[in-house]
UniProtKB/Swiss-Prot annotation:
One of its GO terms (molecular function) is RNA-directed DNA polymerase activity. It comes from Saccharomyces cerevisiae (strain ATCC 204508 / S288c) (Baker's yeast). Residues 583-640 are annotated as: Integrase-type zinc finger-like. The lineage of its organism: Eukaryota, Fungi, Dikarya, Ascomycota, Saccharomycotina. The keyword Chaperone does not apply. This is Transposon Ty1-ER1 Gag-Pol polyprotein. The gene is TY1B-ER1.
Length: 1755
């Protein structure tokens, strides 16, 4: 190995002449055989001067036989007699040749040199002979020698002859690499020419000028063997020599041929780099020229990839073709064929040949099958390694080693193309060669084998970030199973067995070490230059050594193949073997606590803080040595990474120094955090924190609001606590300037107590760093604890309190003490602490029955402040309890489906840690069992009503120790607890009703039920969320009901009369009235429901069923009966056929009960198997006679029985709770880009229309002076954030016109370039529908206008710049905007302000307050939607007058004047309107749907029949885990967005009958299961089948003196996910449906009455706003009415009872409704359920019912 290293450096010892030739480069345009004559003469002069001092002495030697080139040698051949050859680099020719010279030329007598390093050779002896020039050639050779007297001559020669014939010839350099052979052979040919052997060199045709002699052939062979060692020969040369080892002529001939080819390649590259095209020649000729060049280069092994080729072509484009540089340069995957398609398109436009396509045009689809490929598709992914500095040779291409980092070569850009064309182009592929470099087999396949490794050496790798070796015998201090992830360049993981140190002992006797990873899965042993640099060792590739920064040489570098290596002899061996590394373990007897366990135990604090705390005994029970800290440095807690993710560290040292002078508890910092949204109402939304400046002791207090009295209570509490506990007085409290601190109440309190408030200055957050950082730290801990435990978010303050307890006990690295120690308190006993969310089993000391389980699964939160117990959360009871009666659940971490903390189990560690405390608990069990106040152990902190999602598996058999359990058996029993999985509850519904995690004022073991009906019907759980309501039949035998259960322990709250009604079934979530089921009288209901507080479900005391109407207020001017008839008379209600009286059986005898089998029912923990119901409710029938969907009783019962089971938890969160609006739904893209509309548009006619529209838009932009044309700005001079990207979009309008629009990319506009406070208003859809309805009733003329390029009339205030349009060809310039270009964020607001000002000042209009874009005067009403105007007037001349005024300022186009008395068709904002003045108006979208629906790729009419309803009643959406891959998931979500987007657009325009289905499916956009997609397809199919349906309006009777505005309301109780109710409202003006709304209730209702109140309260605000709009547009009096089918709701609104409602949310709504009715002349009436057309908004209906409710207003 050492000989190889020395020999590899030996070429450096050549003379300067040799070095100069070696470094000489041949110019790309120069003859490859031409060498500078001046350089040759200079070398010859130096050689002559040196040779003139030589003398000759005879000598002889025997040449050993070469075993590699062995051939028979005649025995009679004597050895040649030649002088010694002391220097192998130079040669000398004697005056006359010896007689035996010809024998020297025998192949078996070839001399050898030390440069032949192959093991097949042996070193030459000191008498090795050098080949001599043949005597037949007249010009001798001579070589100077640096040693005098060491020349060799023939015995027959004379000094005079030698002197007269001496000439110096420079020898060729030594070949050192196969890649250098093309350059070397040039110098060798020049050597032969200088030796007067130019006649034997083959010419271009492969034949020499003259015949070569035997002596010349021998000389040729010998010199070739000396200066071209066999190991450095290319593969093709070796192949020639393997056939005939003396055929040097063939090698020369082929080399010259390759050189000529290289010259052609150089010319091709120069031509390609200097392409010029401006359209003066045919485009196909230009394409043929370029593709021929690329094909030649590809065939010669020089692959020009598509990116380089396209850039070279685009660089040469000029004239009309120049803009292709700017439109195509960003296309990363553009091909040459695609680029030429653009060139052909422009050439066609120039030549005017658009009628027919030329033959040379190719489709893009054909390009894929083209035999010519410009992309190297077989290129492997490699790492470009270039360990040399920038002034060294080019980088080598290596195989993809297993390393974690790779350096990618920079991509070619325009700058690289613009370099001198004489320089060779650097390509990014190992087949992309420099000019003159030969593409050989060695070049292509050298790195595809593992035999290119140099044994006993480490490969130097600049791309690797870590050092890796395959053998463990050099690893010191090894440790197994390191937590290190290593990937190779292909992003594949490399398994790591161990990590240790690699120690070096260099030749200067210095030692150093670096980290090393052990793995057998790599091809080479890799030595990272990055890690060497870290220990001050660098690689110098000019000297080929490793050296320090001071220049000290440490070791040589060997270049072998394409890589650089360093010998392993410098590594110090170790005694560790592979089995030792793979079997490192810890003895069980000395097993320490793993750091991940301690990290989690101590609230996820960092390792440094924990170690400080253990060293200073702030954490007791065990020492620092009891923890295994080996993984602390590299350990990454995934929960900490998620929960504590932050931007950057806070700024340190921001506090004032004088604060350190205060005594403990004299200077406090305080701050408020919050609010936390989407929590139950009793969970705290805020917390206030206090930090003592001196001790850093922290306090936290929960807050529900930030009112003055709440803050004052907390201040009073903490001041009293500090005064009594620490005998200290607070002097200063530092706080921010929030209103909660600066109010007068708190200021007086602080002044009264002598406390100085210290407020921060404005925007000085640094001065408040202590409190701010504490809140951030606590919030980080909170997120981490919740993430780790999986507990619901409403327990967030428990996590805050747990973190505060722990952090008060952890030592500060600065003070070396904890806050508790500073305050004089004892340290925290960790044996009393449990991990947050630790599963436990709590003993139930007061079970319902003696046979019931005594153990309740729970989750530990934090130690109690008020006792020695622990605060534990019980999901099944929805409680938090303070107790010591618990057992730690073994084998369970808190987050069962998440991180396993490196597969570590902490059960044994937790048992050891809490052993003493568990014994303490067990010893106190008997004493506590005799305590009379044992109930106080379950002092419930809250009645948290969670989303009733039970744990995945309930521990039905888990029993905690009973009261009689001996202390000695307590621990043993805990070990026998069932191992069934207990899952922490998921996130609760944010709108869940009351919960309280604070100690309740009145302790109660059972919750009170104020309303049996609502409680019993409000807590049912469903396994599957229903999309559609359950089905029912008209007769009682086919009806199915869900039972409601009641616990025996609550039976005392009912009267004895109720016992006769046990096991009475009630309906499920429907909760609506049905005539087929007899009504229960109010008196009978009152008998059943007693001892109840007033509730919103109370039935009316008086019965008004004789008229089915319950008026709320009797006006003084209009009679109640007349008002009722007036409101209902014109409504499009269905006509019901008369019903014959029917006898019904007693429902309490005929309907069978359905009992729950859940131990803890879904009714909030109330009830068991002995459940009974207390009240009956009614259901609607599915359909009176027939239906297309037949569902059997068994099927219906099966689906509804699942409603009694707890819902399953979901692994994948792809189901959103609700979509209240359609703003998030992506619209379908209907526009085209420039390349789609023009460049690649195959429709010639359409293309011409788009080109015409393009030029029209450009002319309009110039006409409007959109930008400043006087000055163009350089891109480098403008702030990039003020530069707005622009583009052209094209679309085809519904009237068939083609439109082009130049728009700005406002979606990427910088926020600093517009005022976010400005609003872009458009007319509300309800305002448009109201205006249209009033126009029909008042015989108005309707005129439709359009203002061309509306936005361009509005000036822009900001300084913005855009890139010029493509046709200008100025990509490097910018132009300043002067007008509001379409797409800018501020354009809409600017135009709105401009047109608003003009309409008010010039047209005499005024905007209706509260209704933007609705303008009116005494004669005309205008609805404005961007650039569309709709004018309404009874006098057409008034409209014409407005038009004339508008045309003075704006380019106004009349779309439809509306002067005809016949039917007029409009297209207004997507609505296709047919209007005959004074008769009717029809609104539809048939043409639009006919065009758009087929483009959705939905299979229409798959069964060849039309649907009669949009959905199926009784169908549930199965919400089990959605198992699809990510690509398919994204594709289906995108499809759902398109389908629901179109359906929403149509539904909210006029198809109000579809809103329930649209809203429900919109909630499942992110859950695109097969079932959801099928139901969506069914909805789209129904829209397609009914696309001709129209919303029908008829003119109101002229005798009507008033406008009647009515809202019909309905609610479907509990039929949505999380037991939310669906509410719906329909709005009618003078009997015409003008709008509708269907949505999920934002609050969880507990009864049908609450749902109905919620629905009505949602309709009132819009009803009042519409009333104001109608009165502004039409001066007639208006009557407002509300219709509902809920008698109890009407009774509540009518009632004057001021007693407290059961639920304050719905009580507030009910009281507001009372105020609305009493103050706004709002009439509320009852409507029969079968006539309630709002029913279609809340639930799926049978076909007959659906048709009956909708056929009067949409058909």
């Amino acid at each position: 190995m050492e000989s190889q290293q020395l020999s590899q450096h030996s070429p450096i010892s050549h003379g300067s002449a040799c070095a100069s030739v070696t470094s000489k480069e041949v110019h790309t345009n120069q003859d490859p055989l031409d060498v500078s004559a001046s350089k040759t003469e200079e070398c010859e002069k130096a050689s002559t001067k040196a040779n003139s001092q030589q003398t000759t002495t005879p000598a002889s030697s025997a040449v050993p036989e070469n075993p590699h080139h062995a051939s028979p040698q005649p025995a009679s051949v004597p050895p040649p007699q030649n002088g010694p050859y002391p220097q192998q680099c130079m040669m000398t020719q004697n005056q006359a040749n010896p007689s035996g010279w010809s024998f020297y030329g025998h192949p078996s007598m070839i001399p050898y040199t030390p440069y032949q390093m192959s093991p097949m050779y042996f070193p030459p002896g000191p008498q090795s002979q050098f080949p001599q020039y043949p005597s037949s050639v007249g010009t001798p050779l001579s070589t100077p020698s640096p040693e005098s007297g060491n020349t060799f001559t023939d015995s027959s020669s004379a000094d005079s002859d030698m002197t007269s014939t001496k000439k110096y010839v420079r020898p060729p350099p030594m070949l050192t690499s196969p890649n250098d052979f093309p350059n070397w052979v040039k110098t060798y040919i020049k050597f032969l020419q200088n030796s007067n052997l130019g006649g034997i060199i083959p010419t271009v045709n492969g034949k020499p000028v003259r015949q070569i002699t035997d002596d010349e052939l021998t000389f040729l062979y010998n010199t070739f063997q000396i200066f071209a060692p066999s190991q450095f020969l290319p593969t093709w040369v070796k192949d020639i020599l393997s056939v005939d080892y003396t055929d040097i002529m063939k090698i020369l001939s082929k080399s010259i041929e390759k050189m000529q080819s290289d010259t052609q390649e150089a010319n091709d590259i120069v031509t390609l780099a200097n392409l010029q095209y401006n359209g003066s020649t045919p485009a196909d000729a230009f394409e043929t020229k370029v593709t021929n060049i690329i094909d030649r280069l590809n065939n010669n092994g020089i692959h020009i990839n598509n990116k380089v080729a396209c850039q070279l072509i685009m660089r040469g484009l000029s004239g009309e073709y120049k803009f292709l540089r700017y439109t195509r340069h960003r296309h990363l995957n553009m091909t040459v064929a695609e680029l030429f398609l653009d060139i052909h398109a422009i050439y066609e436009e120039q030549q005017g040949s658009r009628n027919s396509k030329p033959n040379y045009r190719r489709n893009l689809s054909d390009e894929k099958n083209d035999s010519r490929s410009y992309t190297n598709t077989t290129k492997p992914k490699v790492i470009a390694r270039n360990p040399q500095k920038t002034n060294n040779s080019k980088s080598k291409t290596a195989r993809a080693h297993n390393v974690s980092t790779s350096n990618n070569s920079p991509s070619t850009d325009n700058d690289s193309i613009s370099k001198s064309t004489t320089e060779p182009i650097q390509l990014n592929n190992k087949h992309d060669l420099h000019l003159g470099q030969e593409l050989t087999e060695s070049t292509v396949n050298h790195t595809n084998h593992s035999d290119d490794e140099l044994p006993g050496h480490l490969l130097l790798d600049s791309g690797a970030s870590r050092t890796l070796i395959r053998s463990a015998h050099h690893i010191h201090s090894a440790s197994s199973n390191p937590d290190i992830n290593v990937v190779d360049a292909q992003k594949r993981n490399i398994p790591i067995n161990a990590i240790g140190d690699l120690q070096f002992h260099f030749q200067d006797n210095t030692k150093t070490s670096i980290k090393v990873l052990h793995t057998p899965n790599i091809a080479y042993d890799l030595l990272s230059l990055n890690e060497l640099a870290a220990v001050d060792i660098t690689a110098c590739f000019t000297k080929n050594v490793l050296e320090r920064s001071d220049g000290t040489v440490l070791a040589p570098i060997v270049k072998y193949g394409d890589f650089y290596w360093v010998s392993k002899k410098y590594l110090l061996p170790s005694n560790i073997s592979v089995p030792t590394i793979n079997n490192v373990h810890t003895s069980e007897s000395t097993r320490k606590y793993p750091y991940p366990f301690i990290h989690r135990m101590l609230a996820h604090a960092n390792a440094q803080t924990i170690r400080y705390s253990l060293k200073n005994n702030t954490i007791t029970y065990f020492n620092e040595s009891d923890v295994d800290w080996s993984s602390a440095i590299d350990y990454q807690c995934p929960d900490c990474l998620i929960g504590k993710s932050t931007k950057h560290r806070h700024i340190k040292g921001s506090r004032l120094k004088y604060q350190n002078s205060y005594e403990p508890f004299q200077y406090l910092h305080t701050d408020i955090f919050g609010p936390v949204h989407n929590l139950p109402k009793s969970a705290p939304s805020y917390f206030i924190s206090f930090t003592d400046e001196t001790t850093k002791f922290r306090w936290v207090y929960p807050l529900h609001d930030r009112r003055e009295d709440s803050i004052l209570d907390v201040f009073t509490t903490i001041l009293a606590f500090i005064k009594n506990q620490f005998q200290a007085s607070v002097l200063v409290i530092q706080m921010d300037r929030g209103s909660e601190y600066t109010n007068r109440t708190l200021h007086k309190f602080l002044e009264k107590n002598g406390i100085t408030p210290c407020y921060t200055t404005t925007a000085d957050s640094r001065a408040h760093g202590v409190a701010e950082r504490l809140n951030r730290t606590l919030l980080d801990d909170c997120r981490t604890q919740l993430q780790c435990s999986g507990l619901p978010n409403h327990l967030w303050f428990s996590a805050i309190e747990f973190s505060t307890i722990v952090r008060n006990s952890l030592a500060s690295p600065k003070s070396k003490k904890s806050a508790r120690q500073h305050a004089g308190l004892a340290g925290l006993d960790i044996s009393t602490l449990l991990p947050f969310g630790q599963p436990v089993i709590v003993n139930d000391h007061n079970p319902n029955s003696k046979i019931h389980p005594r153990g309740i699964p729970g989750y530990a939160l934090h130690p109690s402040r008020n006792s020695y117990g622990y605060i534990i959360y019980l999901p099944s009871l929805k409680k938090t309890v303070d107790t010591t009666n618990y057992v730690i659940l073994q084998g369970k971490e808190s987050r069962l489906d998440q991180f396993n903390y490196d597969a570590l189990t902490f059960d044994e560690d937790l048992n050891r840690l809490t052993a003493s405390y568990q014994s303490f608990i067990a010893s106190n069990e008997i004493q506590q069992s005799d305590d009379l106040n044992i109930e106080s152990d379950h002092d419930f902190q809250s009645d948290i009503e969670l989303h009733p999602e039970q744990p995945r598996n309930v521990l039905s058999k888990a029993v905690s120790p009973t009261d009689s359990t001996p202390p000695s058996t307590h621990t043993e029993d805990s070990k026998r607890v069932s191992k069934t999985n207990i899952r922490a509850p998921r996130e609760v519904d944010p709108n869940i009703s009351e919960s309280n995690i604070l100690p309740s004022k009145k302790r109660s073991s059972t919750p009170q039920i104020s309303n049996i009906e609502s409680t019993g019907s409000g807590g049912m759980h469903k396994l599957n969320v229903p999309l559609l309501a359950p089905m029912s039949q008209s007769n009682t035998h086919e009806s199915s009901h869900a039972s409601k259960s009641k616990d025996f322990r609550h039976s005392d709250s009912y009267s004895e009369n109720e016992t006769n009604h046990t096991n009475v079934p009630i309906s499920s979530t429907g909760g609506t009235n049905n005539k087929t089921v007899p009504q229960i009288s109010d008196q009978e209901t009152e008998k059943r429901i007693i001892h109840r507080s007033p509730s919103i479900d109370a039935s009316p005391p008086e019965n008004n069923s004789s008229h089915n109407i319950v008026p709320i207020k009797t006006p003084t001017t209009v009679s109640e009966q007349n008002t009722e008839e007036s409101i209902i008379a014109d409504l499009p209600l269905p006509d019901l056929p008369p019903e014959s009286p029917t006898e019904f059986p007693d429902p309490f005898k005929e309907l069978p009960p359905i009992n729950s089998h859940q131990t803890n029912s879904s009714l909030g923990g109330i009830g068991d198997s002995n459940a009974y119901t207390t009240i009956n409710s009614k259901k609607r029938s599915l359909e009176d006679n027939e239906t297309e969907i037949k569902v059997s009783r068994d099927t219906w019962n099966t689906k509804n029985m699942r409603s009694l089971e707890p819902p399953r938890s979901k692994k994948r969160i792809h189901l959103i709770a609700a979509v209240k609006a359609v703003k998030s739904i992506k619209p379908i893209r209907t526009t085209l880009r420039y390349d789609e509309a023009i460049t690649y548009n195959k429709d010639i006619k359409e293309k011409e229309k788009y080109i015409e529209a393009y030029h029209k838009e450009v002319n309009q932009l110039l006409k409007m002076k959109t930008w400043d044309t006087d000055e163009y700005y350089d891109r480098k001079e403008i702030d990039p954030k003020r530069v707005i990207n622009s583009m052209f979009i094209f679309n085809k309008k519904r009237d068939g016109t083609h439109k082009a629009r130049f728009v700005a990319r406002g979606d990427i506009q910088h926020p600093d370039t517009y005022d976010s406070g400005m609003q872009s208003n458009t007319v509300h859809h309800y305002a448009l529908m109201t205006s249209l309805s009033l126009a029909l009733d008042n015989n108005y003329y309707i005129t439709q206008l359009d203002i061309s390029s509306a936005y361009l009339y509005a000036d822009i205030k900001e300084e913005l710049y855009i890139r010029p349009p493509p046709h200008l060809g100025m990509n490097d310039k910018l132009i300043r905007l002067k007008k509001s270009l379409y797409g800018l964020k501020q354009s809409g607001a600017n135009w709105y302000e401009t047109i608003k000002s003009y309409l008010i000042k010039q047209c005499g209009m005024e905007e209706v307050r509260g209704w933007s874009c609705v303008f009116k005067n005494s004669q005309v009403t205008i609805c404005l939607f961007v650039d569309d105007m709709i004018l309404f007037s009874k006098d057409l001349n008034a409209n014409k007058k407005i038009i004339t005024t508008l045309k003075k300022q704006y380019d106004t186009k009349i779309i439809n004047l509306g002067e005809s008395d016949n039917e007029i068709q409009y297209d207004i904002l997507g609505l296709e309107i047919k209007y005959q003045r004074g008769k009717y108006m029809k609104l539809g979208m048939e043409n639009s749907l006919t065009e758009k629906i087929p483009k959705l790729n939905v299979p229409l009419n798959p069964k060849g029949r039309k649907l009669s309803a949009p959905g199926q009643p009784g169908l549930y959406i199965d919400q089990d885990e959605l198992e699809i891959d990510e690509d398919e998931y994204k594709e289906k979500v995108h499809e759902m967005q398109k389908l629901i987007g179109l359906a929403s657009y149509v539904g909210y325009k006029f198809r109000f009958d579809l809103l329930y289905y649209i809203n429900t499916l919109a909630q499942h956009i992110l859950f695109p299961s097969r079932q959801v997609l099928d139901m969506t397809y069914e909805l789209i199919q129904f829209m397609w089948d009914t696309r001709d349906k129209q919303l029908i309006w008829h003119k109101n009777k002229p005798t009507e003196p008033d406008n009647k505005l009515v809202a019909i309301s309905d609610a479907s109780y509990g039929n949505q996910p999380y037991y939310k109710s669906q509410i719906g409202n329909i709005y009618l003006l003078n009997g015409k449906v003008i709008g509708g709304k269907s949505t999920k209730a934002s609050l969880t209702c507990t009864s049908t009455t609450e749902a109905e109140i919620h629905a009505i309260s949602e309709s009132v605000p819009l009803l009042n706003n519409l009333s104001y709009l109608i009165q502004e547009l039409n001066k007639k009096p208006i009557i407002k009415g509300l219709l509902t089918d809920s008698r109890s709701t009407i009774s509540i609104i009518k009632s004057t009872n001021e007693e407290k409602f059961r639920n304050r949310f719905f009580g507030t709504k009910a009281m507001r409704l009372r105020d609305e009715v009493s103050g706004n002349n709002l009439y509320v009436y009852y409507i029969e359920t079968k006539k309630n057309i709002a029913d279609v908004m809340t639930k799926p209906l049978p076909i007959k019912t659906f048709k009956l409710l909708t056929n009067k207003w949409i058909h």
